Regions:
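Catalytic-core helical/loop segments in enzymes performing group transfer/polymerization on anionic/lipid-linked
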Residues: 1-368
Length: 368
């Protein structure tokens, strides 16, 4: 809905570009072990660190086909696409090799590359070597900027706001799951660390009294490789799984929301006005230092926990009326600080987005 309104305000006619999803037929890979000619700059150098030499000696063997044998294929395919004045992306620059090559070629010709956060709350300390900031002409973030060249904008996907609080609703645990193998350089739990997250959540539930546990529902993460939904069913029975159809419905029909990770879901829950907590492994989720004061406030207010026993004790103490705790002065102070640092809340956020895109098109908004 937000995107359609944005198209209308900018007088753009939306269309689907299915060719980005077309199957790519790459050539057969070369025998990388028998490459005869290697650029001198890629050869070993005793002045380099051991790891740098390792990379230089192995990079030709490890480069994906798409960027060696198949790069001409991608160049040819993208040359048939339309020209773009501005390119706006939140996900495609990660997942689509064809989009990456097309957008790079367009940027070389003078297009503006605008990369937006597709979510977030407490941004990771490290994520893909700040690659997005390095390649974007405009880098959009939801909350306070922490790097030069970032532009703060209101979130374009926060819209679930409680109208009628259900004091008899569920206590909802919003779960986390990750892929089976590490896939990105970032300070988030990946691979088997996902099981550590699950074990913490399981132990937390086991610390609750039977009366409170009956009110507990889990919303499993929709994607992932560790089958956490099945694990919850095996450990607690099928009844513990939330029957709500969407994340928004889960949040809005809860008396209390407990998030298992400090990213988009945490922002959505905090924004909703429903009493919200977070229980997570702090050592797995290293975040930007701009949040240090906020983290202290969240912990003091009982919103943030890293200890499952203390979190369970807090839930037990507020389960009867979470809204009373949610409206305490100390809790409100922490909530307001979260909104100040992590969200950009405006009464009509689309106005800011329209203004940004018009300024970029007119050349009036300075590039990175």
């Amino acid at each position: 809905r937000f995107l359609l309104k944005l198209y209308f305000r900018l007088r753009l006619f939306p269309r689907s570009e299915a060719r980005f999803n077309k199957a790519i037929i790459y050539p057969k890979p070369l025998d990388r072990n028998n490459l005869d000619k290697v650029e001198p700059s890629l050869s070993s150098d005793h002045s380099r660190h051991y790891f740098e030499n390792f990379v230089m000696e192995n990079i030709l063997r490890d480069l994906p086909i798409s960027y060696l044998e198949g790069y001409k294929t991608l160049l040819k395919m993208q040359s048939q696409f339309c020209e773009a004045e501005n390119i706006f992306t939140a996900n495609a620059h990660f997942a689509s090799e064809l989009f990456k090559v097309w957008s790079a070629e367009q940027q070389f010709k003078g297009s503006n590359l605008i990369i937006s956060s597709h979510g977030g709350a407490l941004y990771p300390l490290y994520t893909v070597f700040d690659h997005q900031e390095k390649i974007a002409d405009y880098r959009i973030v939801w909350g306070l900027e922490w790097m030069r060249g970032q532009t703060r904008m209101p979130a374009n996907k926060l819209n679930a706001k409680v109208k009628s609080y259900n004091s008899n609703g569920d206590i909802s645990l919003i779960d986390y799951d990750g892929l089976k193998y590490s896939y990105r350089c970032a300070t988030i739990p990946m691979g088997p660390l996902t099981v550590e997250v699950y074990n913490q959540n399981k132990d937390f539930i086991n610390c609750l009294s039977q009366d409170v546990r009956k009110k507990m529902k889990v919303r499993p993460f929709p994607l992932g490789g560790w089958e956490t939904k099945d694990r919850y069913i095996d450990d607690f029975g099928f009844d513990i799984i939330s029957s709500q159809g969407s994340l928004s419905n889960t949040i809005l029909n809860s008396r209390l929301v407990i998030c298992a990770y400090p990213q988009t879901t945490f922002s959505e829950a905090m924004y909703s006005g429903i009493p919200t907590m977070i229980l997570f492994h702090e050592e797995f989720w290293e975040v930007q230092p701009i949040y240090n004061e906020l983290i202290s406030l969240l912990k003091e207010a009982g919103i943030m926990y890293t200890d499952k026993i203390l979190a369970a004790q807090h839930v037990e103490s507020i389960a009867g009326d979470p809204m009373e705790w949610w409206n305490e002065p100390q809790t409100i102070l922490a909530r307001e600080k979260f909104n100040e640092l992590c969200l950009t809340i405006e009464s009509n956020p689309i106005d800011s987005w329209v203004e940004l895109f018009r300024a970029i098109s007119a050349g009036g908004s300075s590039k990175r």
